[in-house]
Amino acid sequence: MTVIASVSASILPDHTGLASAVRHDADTTLPASIQPSVVVNLSAASTSASAQTYSAQGTLAGGGQLVWRNNVQDPISVMMAHQFRANTLSERFSGLGAALLDNFNKGSSNYSQSVQVQGASGPSTAPANMHGDVSLRIKTRSGALVTLSITSLANGMDIKVQSDSTLTDEERGAIANLADGFQSALDGLTQVPPKLNLTGLAGFDTRQLSSVDLQSSLNNGAVVPSSADVHLDKQNSAVKVSLPEGKMQLSVSTGNPAIQGSAGQRAAAVANLIEQLDNAARRGHGNPTLVSMFKDAFTTFNGKAGTLDSAVMNLPLNDREHAMLTGLADYSGSITDTPTHPNPLRPGEVDKFEWTASQSTTFKGSTADDHTITQTQKMHLTAAYHRPLKPGQPLQLSTDPDSQNYYYDVVNDDAQSRADVAMQNGLLTNATLTQSADQNLHEIKVVKNKITDDHTVPGHQARTLDLLNLLNQVPLDGTPDQSRNLGDTDPNLIKVHNLVLLTSVLSSNDAS
């Protein structure tokens, strides 16, 4: 349900006929996307000196003309009139996304409205470079395409919703059910700092809809705008985010539901990856906003993967095999902070953070009784940063040699894990885990512009574990898929699964 705030009728188009305050202005030139059918004159004499966008009477502070594309007073127009000159994008987009998709429950597929201020004598209190462009594309299983766009400029707003085909009642309902999810995504992207709230969109009805795409370009007054690109369908989920602080991307392929484990296995794998990222962010000084957005997306996309219908699996796996896999869909992701050069006397010392993680799974064979599986996990961290000689001291690096007192750390970490599984004549014949972890820290100490220490701390771990005997102790029930979902309860399966999960430092646990 969308709540519409009260707005004075004097700033809205009058659909019953406009008096002297409203005229069609042939001399007014607007962008092609905002061609007026109604112009509302707002006299400066009728406004107060308030710095607020609207006076108590509903007029614009500073006077001006409100130009509307369509002469209607619908709830969306009311929201636009109330919000389009707000001081933040979060306020401007508040409730609009949900209201637009809610309309599909009312039989409406197309909507178009715009409003723009012309001739205002007082500038908006919002930053002059504030703008926002958001588009949502929804494809139905029948092939219909629904497009929605919201554009917010310094002195105007433009909204369009269009369907290229007639929608069924079921399709309308599925689209309307995305209202809260779409609004949550907008609220997250427009807040400062931004967040990725994609759970509602990722849970779209796959019986009626085939894909959902969300794109945004937003600027809350920063020098560099932020952008996000989200794609969701039944087999793939992907997001790319670009901020002034850096970029992150994640893609998850759910096209092979056979490798998805039990709920407990998936939860453990998600928690482990998040823990590894947190460790990398602390070790490499990663940007917290990008780290948080990656974790939100990773949790959401793998939650979506867990809800897929596993009845379409061509190659069911038994409990022993699932223990050798993470339980997650294959993925690839990265975080790259924008490099900085904080030391003017040594510009070659770059502060940076680059983290990547991935999982890939390959199958050979086409039956449950005879096949091999190889699953590879990889994680890499490259980072560099300056820090003070004493914790808590501010770094005040300048061209003055006396300011050159700091540590410069360069991190280069790499971790890999490979699981090899083989079934032959219905029996598990291979369950091998090969893992390695390398951590390298190169540290330079500078005192009054002189390098007083320069050393490297290397670290290397490697192991190969044969887990076949441990897994063969787990009983199977003889059903076609030989699975009783013991992955969350059997101690041997839990132990094996914990060993499988990729870590930047190998634990002392083994198969004993």
Predicted segments with their positions:
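A eukaryote-biased signal for long
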Residues: 229-512
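N-terminal, intrinsically disordered, small/polar-rich Type III/flagellar export signal
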Residues: 90-216, 222
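Long, low-complexity, repeat-rich, intrinsically disordered, solvent-exposed domains used
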Residues: 134-137, 149, 160, 202-262, ...
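Short, compositionally biased, intrinsically disordered N-terminal export/targeting signals
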Residues: 1-74, 78, 82, 141, ...
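Amphipathic, non-membrane alpha-helical segments that mediate helix-helix packing
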Residues: 69, 75, 82, 93, ...
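Alpha-helix boundary/N-cap detector
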Residues: 67, 84-91, 95, 166, ...
